[in-house]
């Protein structure tokens, strides 16, 4: 039996030790994994970085059986899929996502990461700064989200960082399979629910 090929994109600031846990997980499921790394939050939300990524990106493979994104990694995936050179895929997994370029999602993330900003209307500030710049990006991303690929969304009832209203509507509209865990914080679902998480992947692979 040939190995599955997996494209893995982690969350903002993911450490190599965490990446290795997911690579080991896929190895145990008879899959080879390519990890696509981005440097920082600025790679996602700075237009000059977008341009550089889209111009210079070189995919490690032309096609992947599965793309596995965690949290904001789904935004970096969008940039890769709109680069001059890119890859195709058959199935996609959104762990603690999918994220969007919408200001509401950005505000939720900033408030969770930097609690002091809860006293500021980050959403309004962002809208005033770059609304025109983000309109095209949002539309492009929407087109990538609603492709006919098979989808699996993994969430936790305890996760307060995702835009839950959007994610639930996305699951319904896209027909994605959904597994919700009773425990586990944002972008940390596997380490808290190893057996259930692994079984969700196995079921999705066999689908």
Where are these regions (language model features)?
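Conserved alpha/beta-hydrolase "acid-adjacent" motif
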Residues: 17, 160-166
């Amino acid at each position: 039996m040939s190995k599955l090929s997996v494209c893995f994109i982690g969350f903002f600031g993911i450490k190599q030790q965490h990446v290795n846990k997911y690579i080991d997980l896929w190895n145990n499921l008879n899959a080879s994994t390519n990890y696509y790394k981005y440097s920082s939050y600025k790679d996602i939300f700075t237009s000059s970085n977008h341009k550089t990524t889209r111009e210079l990106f070189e995919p490690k493979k032309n096609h992947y059986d599965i793309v596995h994104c965690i949290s904001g990694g789904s935004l970096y995936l969008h940039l890769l899929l709109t680069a001059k050179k890119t890859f195709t895929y058959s199935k996609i997994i959104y762990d603690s996502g999918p994220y969007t370029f919408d200001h509401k999602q950005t505000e939720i993330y900033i408030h969770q990461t930097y609690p002091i900003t809860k006293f500021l209307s980050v959403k309004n500030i962002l809208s005033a700064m770059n609304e025109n710049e983000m309109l095209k990006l949002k539309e492009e991303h929407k087109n990538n989200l609603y492709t006919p690929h098979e989808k699996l969304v993994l969430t936790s009832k305890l996760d307060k960082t995702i835009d839950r209203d959007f994610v639930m509507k996305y699951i319904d509209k896209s027909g994605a399979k959904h597994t919700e865990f009773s425990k586990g914080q944002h972008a940390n679902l596997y380490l808290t629910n190893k057996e259930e998480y692994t079984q969700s992947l196995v079921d999705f692979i066999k689908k």
